[in-house]
């Protein structure tokens, strides 16, 4: 990717020449600023983690939530402008959750002529068969979904699975691991799966959840709720979200500082004895 292309410059062209998804987007100064900020965040992550190789094919996971819609829209925005020379295939895995509106995502993708694959796999029955109703389904559900997405990526000849985790997801995961797992770990912008044949990419790791929420509302995406199964995300993650939002409220800018810290790690100044052979 050319690093000397300025997001501000190509957005000065206006909205007449843009991906069809943006044809009815707001033309306000506020939305322009939001869109440019998110695109800068995305390009920075793509550059920082060397995500891009020309001619690749990416499988973009689409759950129907605000973040996955935003991820797809911003990737298509860059691709439309010639700044993302990869083939994009959107993919939704219908996991058999009761009440899941099967028509929403296919209708949305077809309306914009976005290449896609919709697959049904009843992982919901597997999860409910293994866990009690009082337990949180999210972790097992996520692992089963990831396995199917890896398989689909291979079947479709994709080099990478692209996920919509943003800055706040990264920080919440870091503090969950710190407080409850006793380890320093978060969500990387780029990793290789255990089999070594697929990359997992997170181009939104620098994007704020607040910005993604505003973007989703402005674009009027047909959001599908994530709690159709009746399970709520764990109390631990919710507690981390509340803590981080409180810190940000009292000391604005701390979330960005924390993300910078995760990009500036000094292992020799930590206490992992495996790092010391002298």
UniProtKB/Swiss-Prot annotation:
Pfam families from the UniProt entry: ATP_bind_3
Query: GO terms for CC?
Result: cytoplasm
- According to its UniProt record, in which pathway does this protein act? tRNA modification
Q: Which cofactor does it need?
A: Mg(2+); [4Fe-4S] cluster
Q: Which GO molecular-function terms appear in the entry?
A: 4 iron, 4 sulfur cluster binding; ATP binding; magnesium ion binding; sulfurtransferase activity; tRNA binding
Q: Is Iron-sulfur one of the keywords?
A: yes
Spell out the CDD domains in the cross-references.
Answer: TtcA-like
Record's cofactor remark: Binds 1 [4Fe-4S] cluster per subunit. The cluster is chelated by three Cys residues, the fourth Fe has a free coordination site that may bind a sulfur atom transferred from the persulfide of IscS.
Q: Where is the signal peptide?
A: none
Give residue numbers for sequence motif PP-loop motif.
63-68
Q: Give UniProt keywords alphabetically.
A: 4Fe-4S, ATP-binding, Cytoplasm, Iron, Iron-sulfur, Magnesium, Metal-binding, Nucleotide-binding, RNA-binding, Transferase, tRNA processing, tRNA-binding
Which Gene Ontology biological process is one annotated for this entry? tRNA thio-modification
Function statement: Catalyzes the ATP-dependent 2-thiolation of cytidine in position 32 of tRNA, to form 2-thiocytidine (s(2)C32). The sulfur atoms are provided by the cysteine/cysteine desulfurase (IscS) system.
Q: Which family does it belong to?
A: Belongs to the TtcA family.
What's the miscellaneous note?
Answer: The thiolation reaction likely consists of two steps: a first activation step by ATP to form an adenylated intermediate of the target base of tRNA, and a second nucleophilic substitution step of the sulfur (S) atom supplied by the hydrosulfide attached to the Fe-S cluster.
Q: What is this protein called?
A: tRNA-cytidine(32) 2-sulfurtransferase
* Species of provenance: Bartonella bacilliformis (strain ATCC 35685 / KC583 / Herrer 020/F12,63)
Corresponding gene?
Answer: ttcA
